[in-house]
Amino acid sequence: MKSEIKKNDIVKVIAGDDKGKVAKVLAVLPKTSQVVVEGCKVVKKAIKPTDDNPKGGFIHKEKPMHISNVKKA
């Protein structure tokens, strides 16, 4: 599906928990018709301990949302 929304565009979220937020597009996923928007749909993800990070812990990461839930601002 062809989309007007590209990476680094400024968009407004029109549906969901983050409705009304204006933010930058970090990635576009054309196969699934989804976009990753900066600061929207943030989840807390557990990280297992590794050699680089011996304690492990949690990180906050943006999850994709459907492209129909955003419009260009």
Swiss-Prot record:
The gene is rplX. Gene3D superfamilies: 2.30.30.30. It comes from Helicobacter pylori (strain ATCC 700392 / 26695) (Campylobacter pylori). It holds the Pfam family KOW. Residues 51-65 have a biased composition (Basic and acidic residues). The keyword rRNA-binding applies. Disulfide bonds: none annotated. Belongs to the universal ribosomal protein uL24 family. One of two assembly initiator proteins, it binds directly to the 5'-end of the 23S rRNA, where it nucleates assembly of the 50S subunit. GO terms for cellular component: ribonucleoprotein complex; ribosome. Keywords: Ribonucleoprotein, Ribosomal protein, RNA-binding, rRNA-binding. CDD domains: KOW_RPL26 (cd06089). Part of the 50S ribosomal subunit. GO terms for molecular function: rRNA binding; structural constituent of ribosome. This is Large ribosomal subunit protein uL24. It comes from the Bacteria. Residues 51-73 are annotated as: Disordered. GO terms for biological process: translation. SMART domains: KOW. PROSITE patterns: RIBOSOMAL_L24 (PS01108). The keyword Methyltransferase does not apply.
